[in-house]
Amino acid sequence: VATKQDNNRRKRDPETTRAAILEAAKTVLARDGAEGLSVSTVAKVAGVNRGTAYQHFQVKEDLVRATLDSVSHQLLDAVFEGGGPDGEVPEGQLKPDRDHMDEVIERMAAFNMRLAEYAIENSDLCRVWLFDVLSRENPRQDVFYKRFEQAVQTLAESDAGIEDVDVEVQSVMILTGYFMWPVWVRAHARSKKARKEMARRYAMEVLRNAMYGVLQVDTHSILKAYLKSHM
């Protein structure tokens, strides 16, 4: 519950108020879906005056859209290193190539683990993201999906990638799995250690999938060695 001091601070800082409203909206959206979300309900959860909430978001649709966009950017910031606010790849980022496969695989494994752990520890947020993707006319406009697909495409187009990879299919299969896996984790893992182990399992299998779905055969020995040493 917001204190009087919190409310006074928010009156002086509209950005803080907006951030509090969006955080509350994520909670309501994950719990009740878009049908159960209203500006007044979110205002109550956020601990702000309803009139203040309406100053930021006059209609429910504006609040839903702003909340979904903030979730995509939160995912982007959490699992990708650098880049622009619209999903752009950072300038100067090392591109994958077969002469540096050890480093490429290390980076892929680290990314897989970051995303798997984040999805497991923030399953409500991921549920909101899935809702957004399912409700969009063009899911590829989502900044998080856009950046993920670009990463898969960069790997596929490198001299380590196989020809004719369907980048869109690979991206959808992998991301869907990342955000469904927490359902199984919730049913089986009762501790942070157990959740981390299940995150590791998923991350390693995504890496193995890349071996057969994206990478050329002559790179497999390096990836197999990595898997053997980390399984």
Where are these regions (language model features)?
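Helix-turn-helix
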Residues: 20, 24, 28-62, 66-67
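C-terminal peripheral helix-coil segments that are non-catalytic and often amphipathic
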Residues: 2-4, 121, 153-158, 177-231
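N-terminal intrinsically disordered/low-complexity leader segments
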Residues: 1-16, 27, 83-96, 218-231
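Short, basic, alpha-helical segments at the C-terminal edge of helix-turn-helix-like DNA-binding modules
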Residues: 41, 69-76, 80-84
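Short linear capping/connector segments at secondary-structure termini
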Residues: 90-97, 129-135, 190-191
